[in-house]
């Protein structure tokens, strides 16, 4: 069962990637920068599309909602996803969760970590942590009142608005990311951050292998009876 679930997740992600690539290739050259593709859609949407070349796919609605500084922050965030190959980490986390639902918190932790990684990169590029925080918050709020995102963006996108609660301990990823950007920056090293994400992904791979072996053992036990 675990193996079947993993296959389904892989096929779904592959279809989303193929759809997104076709869409981006058709619109290539209609962007605001060399690696940016603008989709004529009023949805609030932006995501990094990995590959050779990698693209930043952004909706016209998103661009209209941000000023020039906000767009700079957005593009810096998405370029961090492309440069860091963050899709590899998130894919491993999601496959691990598909094989074993108990690992869903692990997948969410990986998603949040790569978003924070990209946030900090955008803050360094712009030199303005408050700008990045405001851009994230604005995009999340507007996304709640615009049309739903296409399938590819829903799977690959990074804009995941959550309802803000009173306590940040129970808040969704967006409020926590904004709070982290508004707080004084902690001394961090990119190598250590990359190592933390890699270790988390490695844990996911290990869990995936464990799930596979458990499935094999259950099949053997069933055959024995």
Predicted regions and their residues:
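Transmembrane alpha-helices and immediately adjacent membrane-cytoplasm interface residues
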Residues: 1-25
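Active-site-proximal gating segments in proteases and membrane effectors
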Residues: 26-51, 127-203
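An active-site-proximal "capping" alpha-helix that borders the catalytic cofactor pocket
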Residues: 112-128
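Juxtamembrane boundary at the C-terminal end of a transmembrane helix
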Residues: 207-225
């Amino acid at each position: 069962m675990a193996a079947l679930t993993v296959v389904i997740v892989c096929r779904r992600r592959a279809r989303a990637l193929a759809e997104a690539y076709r869409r981006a290739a058709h619109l290539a050259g209609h962007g605001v920068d060399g690696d940016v593709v603008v989709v004529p859609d009023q949805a609030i949407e932006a995501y990094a599309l990995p590959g050779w070349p990698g693209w930043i796919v952004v909706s016209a609605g998103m661009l209209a909602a941000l000023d020039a500084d906000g767009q700079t922050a957005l593009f810096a965030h998405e370029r961090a996803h492309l440069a860091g190959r963050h899709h590899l980490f998130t894919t491993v986390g999601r496959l691990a969760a598909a094989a074993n639902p108990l690992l869903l918190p692990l997948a969410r932790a990986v998603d949040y970590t790569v978003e924070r990684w990209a946030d900090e990169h955008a803050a360094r590029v712009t030199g303005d942590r408050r700008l990045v925080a405001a851009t994230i918050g604005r995009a999340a709020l507007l996304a709640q009142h615009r049309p739903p995102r296409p399938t590819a963006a829903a799977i690959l996108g990074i804009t995941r608005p959550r309802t803000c609660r009173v306590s940040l301990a129970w808040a969704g990823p967006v409020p926590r990311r904004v709070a982290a950007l508004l707080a004084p920056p902690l001394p961090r090293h990119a190598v250590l951050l990359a190592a933390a994400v890699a270790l988390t992904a490695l844990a996911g791979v290990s869990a995936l292998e464990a799930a596979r072996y458990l499935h094999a053992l259950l099949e053997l036990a069933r055959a024995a009876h």
